[in-house]
Structure formats: C-alpha cells, structure tokens
Design a protein with these regions (language model features):
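Gly/Ser-rich oxyanion-binding loop with an adjacent helix/lid
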Residues: 1-31, 38-50, 84-89, 96-209, ...
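C-terminal nucleotide
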Residues: 2-36, 61, 65-96, 193-252, ...
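Short Gly/aromatic-enriched secondary-structure transition segments
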Residues: 48-55, 235-236
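Short, charge-rich binding segments
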Residues: 53-55, 63-66, 114-115
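FabD-like malonyl-/acyl-CoA
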Residues: 139-140, 365-369
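Glycine-rich phosphate-binding loop
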Residues: 362
Length: 408
C-alpha cells in the first residue's frame, strides 16, 4: 500500500482472496468505497442548513464471490479472525462480532426490504482509510459492502438507497442515531466535485472542485472523542432554544430572506446574516446568541463556498475555511486545544490556502488546502508544532476528491 495515494495492489488483493477461499479468480468481483471529508458546513444539518462534503481517494476494498451453499464468510486483512454466518439466519447485533456487525446490519436491512438471496457468499476486505479518524471508515464499510452485495446478486439498488440502507442499519442495527451525510456522499460522489447536500430533503447538486496544483491534507488529532455525544446534544438544544425564543418574539424581519417575521421561521438557517443581526438582541443569553450566530453565518459560508468554486477560486474557499474555524472556536465552542493547535499551525504555513476543523468537533480531524509542492514540508512543520504543544503526534495524509462506491 502506498501512503501517498491510498491505493492497494489489486493483484495481491485478489491473491489474498484465493489464499483465504481457494477456487479460481474469474468469479471474484472487486469494489471500492471512499472515505469522506466535510469541506464546510458544520452543525447546520439539524438547523435547516446544507452541508458540503466530498469523497476522497482513501478506500475500503471488497473482493466478493458467491458460494454454492448458504454460508456467509468475512475476512479482513486489517483485522484478525474469520466470521461465519448463514444467509438465512436472523442477524442480530453481538459485541463479539466486531466489524462483522456493520456487515450483518446491512444484510439484515437488505432482507427487510424484500430482497432474496439465492446463495451465500464470501468476502475479503482491505482498507487505506484510517479507522476512527473522523473520515467515516464505518460508512465506507457499510456502503461499499451494500453496493458489492447488490451488484453480486443483481439487486440493482440505487445509489440513494445504498445510502439510506447504510443509515437505516446504523439506526436499527447498530443503534447509532447518525445523519445521512456520510453515507450519502460515499454512495453518490463524483471525482472532481463536492456535493451541496440538503439533509432534510435528501437532495444534492454537484459542484466542481478542481484542485489543480493543490490537495487536501487531513490532520487527525488522535484525541479520543469521549464527550462528543453529550456536547453534541447540548449544542443542538441551544440552537433549538434560540429558534424558540426568536419565534416567540414574533418580530418583523428586514427583507432579503424567505420569511418576514420571526414567528414563521422553521429553522435558524432560514435567516440571512443581515436578518439575524437585526433581531439577535432578542437572544438575551450570550451563549444562546452565539450558537445561533454560528448556524446562520456557517450556512451563508456554505452558499459562498459553492459560489467561489463555480468560479474555480480556491483562495476564496481558503478564506471561508478560516472563518468557519473561527466561528466553531468562538461562537460554537466545539473545537478544543488539539483542533485549534492544528488549524492555527496549518494556517501559518507557507503554501496553506486555508484550514479548519471538520466534523462534529471536540477531537477528530481538521482539513487544510495546501499547494502540492509544499505539502510534505507543511506536514512536517505542523507535526512538530502539534507534538510540542499537545505531547503526542497527529496523523496526516494527502487526498483529492474521488468517486463514490465503484466496481473496479
């Protein structure tokens, strides 16, 4: 595996499959499924805003083949041990099944939706996606597996439904209440683009994202995100409080947005920045006001990002990333010393066009847009600063926008 481009040797991968399962190579089918980043648009999917993710060229790989019996067998080159099940069983979550739970969850939902399996199958998995790195290794696993199974058995499940099956499996099988962004971008992405995604309507538009002589660098804090769920819920409640207070005040709004009175607002992101500034004094609690201000300004940054990329202007996108980090740090207070150190160190480097934290915050990852010829020096310098300040290394890799789940 090459660290630089995140690909594997497919011939070796196929040979590993045959070593595990025997037989001949002709009926083995290969698939890939990418990781993802959210370029801009944090904590606004539940405030009526749009997100702006891209798939990246780090992949999960699947080699899969039908069997003559009803056995389902999983092997993963990154995790020891073989898991064996029967396609006709009622799959249930079991802690000891480890990563196999993600796969069984997908099979359980596919069966629930009425698809019939005429045999079992065997699968081998490999990956260049760092696990637990905040770039959706679990969604890449789920969607890639769902797509591979759908293709192998001729189910013809649409890309949108692949995403929805992944989300349904998280909700019903894994008991994780996730949004749709991760699965959706992984299932539907196109190389050289990002997606403006409306998570409420589940609709997207492709926006050109030609990197030219630049690339993304993903920077992983390697901080365990223990507090993230309770903090996430707290932030969500604060936004709901802000909306409730604005609606209760029933105040006229200046022109320019979709609504003329705060009482009619369905969500915070329906406000323009100008409208919000005109009524923000209704929010007496400074914390509540700042949480709402983040949602409104972040939504506007997403729309601006789309505008500047349609003109191919990466420099303007870089400025928006810096503003977005500042808003997450001071208005939303969802960064922490690790992410702030990475973003600050990154933005100070030569060749860095802009950097910000990405994902839910409180640990996880940051992203930077960096000139390709400066990327190695960038990584070295940021690593040095981070290690000195935080006391342990961060993880880094370079990437560019990539296709969604694919047959190889």
């Amino acid at each position: 595996m090459s660290e630089d481009n995140g690909t594997i040797n497919l011939e070796e991968f196929k040979n590993s499959f045959l070593k595990n399962y025997g037989g001949s190579a002709e009926s083995v089918q290969l698939f890939s499924s990418p990781a993802r980043i959210n370029i801009i648009g944090e904590h606004i999917d539940y405030n009526g805003g749009k997100v702006f993710p891209a798939a990246i060229d780090r992949y999960m790989y699947f080699a899969i083949r039908k069997r003559a019996d009803t056995k389902v067998i999983y092997n993963d080159l990154k995790f020891p041990g073989t898991f064996e099940f029967n396609i006709n069983e009622n799959f249930a979550y079991k802690k000891e099944n480890d990563y196999a739970n993600y796969l069984n969850g997908i099979l359980s939902i596919i069966k629930k939706r009425g698809y019939k399996f005429d045999s079992g199958f065997e699968v081998l998995i490999d990956s260049t996606v760092p696990a637990g790195g905040g770039i959706s290794s679990s969604s890449a696993l789920e969607c890639g597996f769902a797509y591979a199974v759908s293709e192998l058995f001729g189910f013809g499940i649409s890309r949108k439904d692949i995403a929805l099956i992944g989300q349904q499996s998280e909700h019903e099988f894994m008991d994780v209440k996730c949004g749709i962004m991760d699965q959706y971008i992984i299932a539907t992405a196109k190389k050289g683009t990002a997606e403006l995604l409306d998570c409420e309507k589940i609709e997207h538009e492709y926006v050109p994202l030609e990197m030219g002589d630049s690339c993304f660098v993903v920077m992983n804090t390697k901080k365990k995100r223990l507090l993230s769920e309770s903090k996430y819920n707290e932030r969500r409640e604060q936004c709901e409080t802000a909306l409730a207070q604005l609606k209760a005040a029933a105040t006229p709004l200046p022109a320019g947005g979709k609504f003329s009175n705060t009482k009619d607002l369905p969500d915070l992101c329906s406000l323009t920045v100008e409208q919000f500034n005109a009524v923000s004094s209704i929010l007496k609690d400074d914390v509540i006001m700042r949480r709402a201000r983040h949602a409104v300004t972040e939504n506007e940054r997403v729309l601006k990002a789309v505008e500047v990329l349609q003109k191919g202007d990466l420099n303007e996108l870089g400025k928006l990333l810096k503003e977005a980090h500042h808003s997450m740090q001071y208005d939303f207070e969802a960064t922490g010393i690790e992410l702030d150190t990475l973003a600050e160190a990154a933005n100070a480097q030569e060749g860095c066009i802009g950097a910000r934290m990405t994902g839910g915050g409180f640990g996880g990852c940051a992203i930077a847009i960096v000139k390709k010829d400066k990327a190695d020096a960038f990584i070295e310098n940021v690593q040095k600063i981070y290690t000195q300040k935080i006391g342990h290394d961060a993880g880094f890799f370079k990437c560019v926008p990539a296709d969604g789940v694919s047959r190889i």
